[in-house]
From Swiss-Prot:
Residues of the Cadherin domain: 64-209, 210-320, 321-535, 536-639, 640-742, 746-863
Residues linked to a glycan: N135, N326, N332, N680, N748, N803, N844, N849
Pfam families listed in its UniProt record: Cadherin
Extracellular side: 61-890
Record's keyword terms, sorted: Calcium, Cell adhesion, Cell membrane, Glycoprotein, Membrane, Repeat, Signal, Transmembrane, Transmembrane helix
Transmembrane residue ranges: 891-911
Topological relation to the membrane, as annotated: Single-pass type I membrane protein
Protein name: Protocadherin-20
Gene: PCDH20
Gene3D superfamilies to which the protein is assigned, alphabetical: Cadherins (2.60.40.60)
UniProt function note: Potential calcium-dependent cell-adhesion protein.
Lineage of source species: Eukaryota, Metazoa, Chordata, Craniata, Vertebrata
Disulfide bonds: none
GO CC aspect terms: plasma membrane
Length: 951
């Protein structure tokens, strides 16, 4: 899938056009200008001008070619707007906007002119592949065929490939053009437009090396700062900053570094720079990973294995380990018998390590004739039969010659023992595989594996011969019965190639005359695949931060195998339990992860990796990778609800627990630590960060405010910190904490004149009270609890409305002051609250002496309190509480509270309006307003208004 990270707006970023000389018929922008009255007067002249120059201008228009340039990113989806030819050619005013493709372009309308234009490609060609042209609006869009800049414009193409009306132009620079020829019709507005669309490159290709293994040879005598070009540099089809920008080594070994040089064409070549002195004899090879990185955002990487070989120079000469050897030769030795061998060592390689052996010029010719020196192997053999005149001692000076070196010198002192009798003979018969005197054994051969039979005999047949095994090694030489003088050489314990690869022992025989003979046996062990690869650590513990970049490096696995050659070559593989997005390079052991890891999705990964050698059969070992994804602060605190609602009874004590605000943060450690705070209303509410408990600092009164809306912010402890908010709604539930407030009558000292002619059943006055509570706490009942007067039982009060009516016809004896003590009680639970008010009714025809009435009102009445509950048809609310959930009741009370507030407000407005309509008349009841005192005080002297008190 092609990346679209750099895709920008569909609007073309650059537009340039080159029109010919302006002509009134072709410049549509001029036709939209408002005409003045003068232009109408010049119409005849303008008509003649058009008639004369029109044909020439038409011919001129065919010769005009307009060029437009647009640019867009490669890889855009279908339907992205590239540009509008009509607007960019100024065939339509830009303020007019784009025409509706379904609508007909208007003809001449008054002073404006919109020509019916059409747009088409000169020929189809490849146009349907990459762009589409709207024939009416002239809008260019991308087609369903995705534009791939790397496929269209091959670097270095240098030219233009035409196909019909669409062509591809590329050059060694990073420009890539899509060329189109567009015709604008009808003929009288004809234009031939060349459209160039520059395709901008996006970083959709990673650098890639042509080969996975790159080898560089460096002479071991290369001085510091030697620069060596690395062949096969990485290739990136992208251009510009998206191409290869830099190279780096994953492991420098302290000996090398990389530099990048750029040539005139912008090509970057990596150079290997020597940083220290090299010695092939110390280390002949360095292996590292070379990484190529482009300049995109984010950058893409490519890698290959870089093997740096150290080539040999002739900086070492042959050396002998000893300066002198002593050799004994018996006079009866057979011609051609090797008597000794010298060997020098040269640490160089190839021709630099070739050694030839020769005698020094000081060696006498007689010694040279008696002993032959092989110039290639250094073996000294008896060249002629030892005669009686041969010297008993010879000094052989041998030179080891290397190219360009001073010869190394060793001296062989040869002593000749002249004998009359022949020494014992040792005749071997090999059972194991023997080549050129070397026996080859597999390391896994069992104990007591036979190697060879040896026959020990005296050539003269006169002397007894004994033998033994000389040398160290897991071998045993024992007589092989029932045969005499037959001996078997066999192994005594298992052999391990990894501990010792080569053994040298000798079978020594001697007779009773003291003659000794030995036969050297060389044993070379052959390696078996008996060792499995071993990881340095059986448990590989790794860490990586979440939201890592793709193909992030985790570690480089390393396992050793003690076996040799291909049996010791190790390849690395992921175990079957490893997730698919982990990758392991089988050669280098580099472990990477191809995708971003999310700690909140999975924090720990545990899977196996295998190290397998190339033996037959292969052996393997397993290690466990334990990867821990480290946390980043990439998650905001999250409330369990977006909105929280709490129902709290009013008068709730300060710092009481209202409710718990639950919030979580998927991050870990400090990134997941959340602090809560109240954003608004912080002067009233506070929240406990540790528990998330919301508390009110003060007691809440529903009558002052029935609900609160506040916002709580949760902030984590990351850097930078992340936050989120939640809405908290607190609804106060009403409790019966307000007694009814009597609004009328306004004073215990007020009275009302009742005419004796008032008919029974007629309303006389009313008691009106309100309660600030809601629900049943605000339902008011009225009752008369005390009476005083001539016949005060003549009046009754409606328990629901508080209306006081006349029960019986008034008699002559009923004249005077009637005093009714009215109790106004709510239906609160568990304890109803109430207030009282004194209603004074003066029965008389007129009020002739107000001072007399006032004196009566000042006297404290002797009233017997009647504790009668008013009988009103209200459903009982204070029933026995059942063990059910309180939530439905709380919700219902909240609804009733809100409704009651609305009802009380409406009633207050109604009373105010009603009082405004009342006008006192002479024939109506006379009401005298007397100040109210806190308690029932009939001896008031001051007319100071006060509230009615609770009893």
């Amino acid at each position: 899938m092609r990346g679209r990270g750099n895709a920008r707006s569909s609007q073309a970023l650059g537009v340039s056009w080159c029109p010919a000389t302006w002509h009134p018929r072709l410049d549509m922008g001029r036709l939209h200008r408002p005409r003045s009255s003068t232009s109408y007067r010049n119409l005849p002249h303008l008509f003649l001008f058009f008639l004369f120059v029109g044909p020439f201008s038409c011919l001129g228009s065919y010769s005009r070619a307009t060029e437009l340039l647009y640019s867009l990113n490669e890889g855009l989806p279908a339907g992205v707007l590239i540009g509008s030819l009509a607007e960019d050619l100024r065939l339509l005013p830009r303020s007019a906007g784009r025409p509706d493709p379904q609508s007909q372009l208007p003809e001449r309308t008054g002073a404006e002119w919109n020509p019916p234009l059409s747009f088409s490609l000169a020929s189809r060609g490849l146009s349907g592949q990459y762009v589409t042209l709207d024939n009416r609006s002239g809008e260019l869009h991308t087609s369903a065929q995705e534009i791939d800049r790397e496929a269209l414009c091959v670097e270095g193409g240098g030219g233009t490939a035409w196909s019909g009306s669409v062509s591809i132009s590329s050059s060694p620079s990073d420009s890539c053009l899509l060329l189109l020829d567009v015709l604008v019709l009808p003929q009288e507005y004809f234009r031939f437009v060349k459209v160039k669309i520059a395709i901008r490159d996006i970083n959709d290709n990673a650098p890639q090396f042509p080969v996975s293994q790159i080898s560089v040879w460096v002479p071991e005598n290369a001085p510091v700062n030697t620069r060596l070009a690395i062949e096969h540099p990485a290739v990136d089809p992208d251009v510009g900053i998206n191409g290869v920008q830099t190279y780096r080594l994953l492991d420098y070994h302290g000996m090398f570094t990389l530099d990048v040089e750029e040539n005139e064409n912008g090509e970057r070549t990596p150079y290997l720079i020597v940083m220290g002195a090299l010695d092939r004899e110390t280390q002949d090879q360095y292996v590292s990973i070379i990484i190529a990185e482009d300049g995109g955002s984010p950058p893409l990487l490519g890698s290959a294995t870089l093997t740096i070989g150290i080539s040999d120079i002739n900086d070492n000469c042959p050396l002998f380990t000893d300066s002198q050897i002593n050799v004994t030769v018996y006079g009866n030795a057979t011609v051609g018998t090797p008597i000794a061998a010298v060997q020098a060592v040269d640490k160089d390689l190839g021709t630099n390590a070739q050694i030839t052996y020769s005698y020094s010029q000081k060696v006498p010719q007689a010694s040279k004739d008696l002993f032959h020196l092989d110039e290639n192997t250094g073996v000294i053999k008896l060249f002629s039969k030892i005669g009686g005149s041969v010297l008993e001692s010879h000094k052989l000076t041998i030179l080891a010659n290397g190219p360009g070196c001073i010869p190394a010198v060793i001296t062989a002192l040869v002593s000749i023992i002249k004998v009359i009798f022949r020494p014992p003979e040792i005749v071997p018969r090999y059972i194991a595989n023997e080549i050129d005197g070397v026996v080859y054994l597999k390391e896994l051969e069992p104990v007591n594996t036979p190697i060879a039979f040896f026959t020990i005999r005296d050539p003269e047949g006169k002397y007894k011969v004994n033998c033994y095994l000389d040398g160290e090694g897991p071998f045993r030489l024992s007589p092989y019965k029932p045969y005499n003088n037959e001996y078997l050489l066999e192994t005594t314990k298992p052999m391990d190639y990894e501990l010792q690869q080569f053994y040298e022992v000798a079978v020594v025989a001697w007779n009773s005359e003291g003659f000794h003979v030995k036969r050297v046996i060389k044993v070379q062990l052959l390696d078996d695949n008996d060792n499995a690869p071993i990881f340095l650590q059986p448990l590989i513990e790794l860490t990586i931060e979440e939201n890592n970049s793709p193909n992030a490096f985790l570690t480089k696995l390393y396992a050793t195998d003690a076996d040799s050659e291909e049996r010791g070559q190790v390849s690395y593989f992921l175990g079957p339990d490893a997730p698919s997005y982990f990758s392991l390079d089988s050669v280098t052991g580099i472990l990477t992860v191809s995708t971003q890891l999310d700690r909140e999705e999975k924090e720990k990964y545990r899977y196996t990796v295998r190290a397998v050698d190339c033996g037959k059969p292969p052996r393997e070992s397993v290690a466990t990778v334990a990867l821990t994804v480290l946390d980043k602060n990439d998650n905001s605190p999250r409330f369990i609800n977006k909105d929280f609602s709490f129902f709290v009874p009013e008068n709730f004590p300060g710092y009481g627990e209202i409710g718990v605000i639950s919030v979580t943060d998927a991050d870990a450690g400090r990134n997941g630590w959340v602090a809560l705070s109240v954003v608004n209303q912080s002067d009233i509410f506070v929240i406990d960060t540790g528990k998330g408990m919301l508390r009110a600092k003060v007691s809440l009164d529903r009558e002052q405010q029935s609900s609160y809306t506040l916002w709580v912010e949760a902030v984590d402890g990351g850097e930078p910190a992340l936050s989120s908010t939640a809405k908290i709604t607190i609804l106060l539930l009403d409790i019966n904490d307000n007694p009814p407030l009597v609004l009328f009558p306004q004073s215990n000292m007020s009275y009302l004149l009742v005419l004796p002619s008032t008919l029974p059943g007629s309303p006389v006055t009313e008691v009106y009270a309100v309660d600030k509570d809601t629900g049943m706490n605000a339902v008011i009942a009225y009752s008369i609890i005390g009476r005083r007067g001539p016949r005060p039982e003549s009046f009754r009060i409606d328990p629901k409305t508080g209306n006081i009516t006349l029960e019986e016809a008034l008699l002559q004896t009923d004249y005077g002051l009637h005093r009714l003590l009215v109790k106004v009680s709510d239906h609160g639970y568990p304890e109803p609250l109430h207030s009282t008010v004194m209603v004074n009714l003066f029965v008389n025809d007129t009020v002739s002496n107000e001072s007399y009435i006032e004196s009566l009102l000042r006297k404290e009445p002797e009233i017997n309190i009647e504790e009668k509950e008013p009988q009103i048809s209200i459903e009982p609310t204070h029933r026995k509480v059942e063990s059910v959930s309180c939530m439905p009741t709380l919700v219902a009370l909240s609804v009733i509270s809100l409704g009651s507030i609305t009802l009380v407000t409406g009633m207050g407005i109604y009373i105010c309006l009603r009082k405004g309509e009342k006008h006192p008349r002479e024939d109506e009841n006379l009401e005298v307003q007397i100040p109210l005192k806190g308690k029932i005080d009939l001896h008031m002297r001051e007319r100071k208004p006060m509230d009615i008190s609770n009893i």
